[in-house]
Amino acid sequence: MSRILLGASASAALHKACDLASKLAQQDHHVRAVLTPRAAELVSPQLFEALTGEPARTDEFDEAERSGGMDHISLSQWAELVVVAPATADLVGRLAHGLGGDLLTTAILAVPQSVPRLLCPAMNPHMLATPSVARNLAQLVEDGWRLVEPGEGHMACGVEGKGRLAEPPQIIEAVRRALHLED
């Protein structure tokens, strides 16, 4: 099946990224997770490795030393699809403005434009409604990203509203559409 680069940023919804990685691997996709440094403080990259059977990464320079190369370039050339779930407001802003300060953002920036990209935001409803976040999301869509809309409901921060990470089955359906897979 396909080679999927799964980017994950620090969010209370990070547990869903683990479930998503597992489900994609069970469908015979090759899933390599790249976590932001803050996400790696919440969930161990080794968990993603156990769920997918593929290496998971967090730090470009540590990995580059071990592999003898530029990890962000090898990841970008490997990927047939990029999925970012969860995408926090911070990560959305960095991607919208082309800022590459960690392995995840540098790898994504180096992915060829022909590779489909899915963005799955997860954040507090007030953050999602902020004009700057809305502009950043609109910019990414204009740049060719496909948005998997966040759901509504009770948030980890205690409020109700739109901002929950889409459920793994919804994201998997978006993956199928992006890869043009038929049942």
Please give the residue ranges for each predicted region:
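A cross-family phosphate/adenosyl-ligand binding-site feature
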Residues: M1-L119, N124-D183
